[in-house]
């Protein structure tokens, strides 16, 4: 198996921030320069976590994702603020090669089959930090998604990877 360097960025209020709390800017918060830096310095993929609180912020994030897709030379996957099939479509049309559904939200779990059938299994991933959640939805994940993005700070990666048939990408969310 070939190893890849997969980097991630959190978007909040049009800026790159350091984590899910969205309280601190990453460097100066300039999304475009950070994305270009990742692309130009060895990253193989960029994950974008949209931390929008409302639809207006989400539209701003979608515009940034469109701009990022024009200036980077690596695949990009995106997720966050997904409520329905249309939100998945917007991320794909903005330039994401894959969209990940937040499995902490029950509505996203229910959405999995519909978006997979509409856009193809290869375009859909899930994001979780819960072994129990993944175990409860194992059949759905295996049938309708092509990857698990595992927020692994509190989860055993090896045990989780053995649970599902699709690849598991561990992502540490620690800033230290």
Which residues make up each language-model segment?
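Short amphipathic alpha-helical segments
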Residues: 60, 112-113
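Conserved N-terminal beta1-alpha1 strand-loop-helix module at the mouth
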Residues: 1-74, 82-90, 118-126, 130-149, ...
């Amino acid at each position: 198996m070939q190893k890849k360097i997969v980097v991630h960025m959190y978007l909040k209020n049009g800026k790159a921030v350091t984590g899910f709390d969205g309280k601190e800017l990453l460097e100066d918060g300039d999304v475009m320069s950070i994305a270009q830096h990742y692309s130009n310095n060895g990253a193989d993929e960029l994950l974008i976590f949209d931390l929008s609180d409302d639809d207006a912020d989400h539209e701003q994030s979608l515009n940034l994702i469109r701009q990022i897709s024009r200036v980077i030379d690596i695949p990009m996957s995106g997720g966050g603020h997904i409520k329905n099939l249309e939100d998945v479509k917007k991320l794909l049309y903005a330039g994401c090669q894959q969209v990940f559904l937040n499995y902490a939200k029950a509505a996203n779990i229910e959405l999995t089959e519909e978006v997979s059938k509409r856009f193809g299994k290869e375009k859909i991933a899930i994001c979780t930090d819960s072994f129990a959640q993944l175990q409860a939805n194992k059949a759905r994940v295996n049938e309708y998604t092509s990857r698990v993005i595992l927020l692994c700070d509190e989860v055993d990666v090896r045990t989780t990877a053995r649970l599902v048939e699709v690849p598991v990408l561990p992502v540490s969310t620690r800033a230290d």
